[in-house]
Swiss-Prot record:
The modification Phosphoserine is found at residue 32. SMART domains: Amelogenin. This is Amelogenin, X isoform. GO terms for molecular function: calcium ion binding; growth factor activity; hydroxyapatite binding; identical protein binding; protein homodimerization activity; sodium ion binding; structural constituent of tooth enamel. Interacts with KRT5. It comes from Homo sapiens. Belongs to the amelogenin family.
């Protein structure tokens, strides 16, 4: 353990010592520049790779994959939005219609209708009395929006989440009185 600490100290001292001036380096360089210089030299030796990913397999395999990926990605990106645009709007209206507007003709909705009426009334009952009767002990009052496109009327500010506790009474500023001195000669003078 002691040899590793000694080695680390010597290594740190070697990096901290100034180098004599030679071409390509200033006379006195700090540790960060000395560390970055070999990194820049190493990066200049390496062939330039695309910056979008880490290549663990090496350059020979990565160069073979690049043309295949570059040819496959643009068509898939152009096809995915076309596939997702019709599917997402088709799914979004169907999902809200199940709990909000049950259709009696569809048989697939009937088991959902039996389960759904049990759930929404308990969820809707706490929402309706809260706007009518605000309760002071509940800091948040969730209100269902009537229309998402219609702006809500301004509401009074909610009570704070953590109400302020009354502060203890402050002590009035008292005038400083002279402390009794500990020196015998000064004590005689004060007396």
């Amino acid at each position: 353990m002691g040899t590793w600490i000694l080695f680390a100290c010597l290594l740190g001292a070697a990096f901290a010592m100034p180098l004599p001036p030679h071409p390509g380096h200033p006379g006195y360089i700090n540790f960060s520049y000395e560390v970055l210089t070999p990194l820049k030299w190493y990066q200049s030796i390496r062939p330039p790779y695309p910056s979008y990913g880490y290549e663990p397999m090496g350059g020979w395999l990565h160069h073979q994959i690049i043309p295949v990926l570059s040819q496959q990605h643009p068509p898939t990106h152009t096809l995915q939005p076309h596939h997702h645009i019709p599917v997402v709007p088709a799914q979004q209206p169907v999902i809200p219609q199940q709990p909000m507007m049950p259709v009696p003709g569809q048989h697939s909705m009937t088991p959902i209708q039996h389960h759904q009426p049990n759930l929404p009334p308990p969820a809707q009952q706490p929402y309706q009395p809260q706007p009518v009767q605000p309760q002071p002990h509940q800091p948040m009052q969730p209100q269902p929006p009537v229309h998402p496109m219609q702006p809500l009327p301004p509401q009074p500010p909610l009570p704070p989440m953590f109400p302020m506790q009354p502060l203890p009474p402050m002590l009035p500023d008292l005038t400083l009185e002279a402390w009794p001195s500990t020196d015998k000669t000064k004590r005689e003078e004060v007396d």
